[in-house]
């Protein structure tokens, strides 16, 4: 026999589900799904669930958090939609249309109040007040549940605040409610991209382009191309190239992204280490200051261009080329442009 004290306490996820069930039962009474004769039984059931799971159905904030502005019925309809599998025997077009319509979650109709909340959420987004925007969109969704525009907007707010999984959930629900709403596909693509689900992001952008028609918008096509590059890079196991590296900086790179030191060598007279009066490079690199500079050059090859333009280093190179001696290291490193490397 299991003692009551040995029973684990309900998890937060279980508590949220309990609140969602209580809310569903309450809504079923209000919308006429259940009759007034069932009211007493439903109230007893709600009380038992609340006591057992240690939740308070009168806590509006907790109920809102549990449902995210949705209803248990709409959430379940999405689950049914996503788990739907094609039957072994193809159904007629009419039967398929009826099945899709029956399982399609219904978008709540916007009201002046919900649209006002959406506009306030948009303003909060413009001010980068993402938490406030999320709350305002959630309030709008409580008035018009499963509205794809409100869901898509909240997905954008979640993405902006770094909550990519929640963004993907909202955007995916919006695409189920209205598969033709291209903005929801775009935000689903972004959320999946930020979660490193590049194949999922590619699928979302492709669906978005299909929904837009005419080959899709430039923004949607850019998202798709970026995602395709990520997939190719992942398949190659290579790091992505930096988009902001210009041709001049790129030309200063050797194989594997290492800086091309041929320009430095030519500036020093074209001689190898130790030849024609040139000091052995190994002795130079044993100097910790130069070793640090070399590490910085390898991590940021663009610095090589600045190094080539340094007049003090250029004078040193000319002296080397004429067989001159090594400069004083302390005076060389006192040059701010070198000391900061």
Curated annotation (Swiss-Prot):
Origin species: Aspergillus fumigatus (strain ATCC MYA-4609 / CBS 101355 / FGSC A1100 / Af293) (Neosartorya fumigata)
Pfam families: SGTA_dimer, TPR_11, TPR_8
Domain of life assignment: Eukaryota
Family membership: Belongs to the SGT family.
GO molecular function list: identical protein binding; molecular adaptor activity; protein serine/threonine phosphatase activity
Signal sequence extent: none
Annotated InterPro entries: SGT, SGTA_dimer, STI1_HS-bd, TPR-like_helical_dom_sf, TPR_rpt
Subunit structure and binding partners: Forms homodimers. Component of the get4/get5/sgt2 sorting complex. Dimers of sgt2 bind directly a single get5. Binds HSC family members ssa1, sse1, hsp104 and hsc82 via its TPR domain.
GO cellular component: membrane; TRC complex
Domain notes: The tetratrico-repeat (TPR) region has the ability to directly bind multiple HSC family members including ssa1, sse1, hsp104 and hsc82.
UniProt entry keywords in alphabetical sequence: Chaperone, Cytoplasm, Repeat, TPR repeat
Subcellular location: Cytoplasm
Chain intervals for the UniProt region annotation (Disordered): 86-123, 232-280
Full protein name: Heat-shock protein cognate (HSC) co-chaperone sgt12
BP GO annotations: post-translational protein targeting to endoplasmic reticulum membrane; response to heat
Record note on what altering residue 181 to A does: Impairs binding to HSC proteins
Compositionally biased spans, kind Gly residues: 269-278
Role: Heat-shock protein cognate (HSC) co-chaperone that preferentially binds endoplasmic reticulum-destined tail-anchored (TA) proteins and directs them to the GET (guided entry of TA proteins) pathway via get4 and get5. Get4 and get5 form an obligate complex that catalyzes the transfer of tail-anchored proteins destined to the endoplasmic reticulum from sgt2 to the cytosolic targeting factor which then targets the TA protein to the ER membrane via get1/get2.
């Amino acid at each position: 026999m299991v003692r009551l004290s040995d029973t684990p306490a309900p998890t937060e996820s279980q508590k949220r589900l309990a609140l969602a069930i209580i809310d569903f039962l309450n809504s079923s009474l209000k919308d006429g799904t259940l009759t007034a004769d069932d009211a007493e039984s439903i109230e007893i059931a709600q009380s038992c669930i609340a006591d057992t799971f240690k939740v308070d159905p009168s806590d509006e904030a907790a109920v809102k958090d549990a449902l995210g502005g949705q209803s248990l019925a709409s959430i379940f309809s999405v689950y049914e939609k996503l788990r739907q599998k094609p039957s072994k025997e193809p159904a007629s077009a009419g039967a398929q249309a009826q099945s899709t319509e029956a399982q399609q979650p219904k978008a709540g109709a916007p009201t002046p109040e919900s649209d006002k909340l959406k506009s306030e959420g948009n303003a909060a987004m413009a001010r980068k007040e993402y938490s406030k925007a999320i709350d305002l969109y959630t309030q709008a969704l409580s008035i018009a549940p499963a509205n794809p525009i409100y869901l898509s907007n909240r997905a954008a707010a979640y993405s902006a605040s770094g909550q990519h999984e929640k963004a993907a959930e909202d955007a995916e629900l919006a695409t189920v409610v209205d598969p033709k709403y291209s903005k929801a596909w775009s935000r689903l693509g972004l959320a999946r991209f930020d979660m490193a689900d590049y194949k999922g992001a590619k699928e979302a952008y492709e669906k978005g382009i299909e929904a837009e028609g005419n080959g899709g918008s430039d923004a949607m096509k850019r998202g798709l191309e970026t995602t395709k590059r990520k997939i190719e890079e992942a398949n190659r196991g290579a790091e992505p190239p930096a988009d902001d590296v210009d041709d001049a900086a790129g030309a200063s790179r050797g194989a594997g992204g290492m800086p091309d030191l041929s320009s430095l060598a030519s500036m020093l007279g074209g001689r190898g280490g130790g030849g024609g009066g040139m000091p052995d490079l190994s002795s130079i690199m044993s100097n910790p200051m130069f070793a640090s500079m070399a590490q910085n050059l390898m991590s940021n090859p663009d610095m090589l261009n600045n190094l080539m333009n340094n007049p003090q280093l250029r004078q040193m190179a000319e002296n080397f080329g004429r067989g001159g001696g090594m400069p004083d290291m302390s005076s060389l490193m006192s040059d701010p442009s070198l000391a900061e490397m």
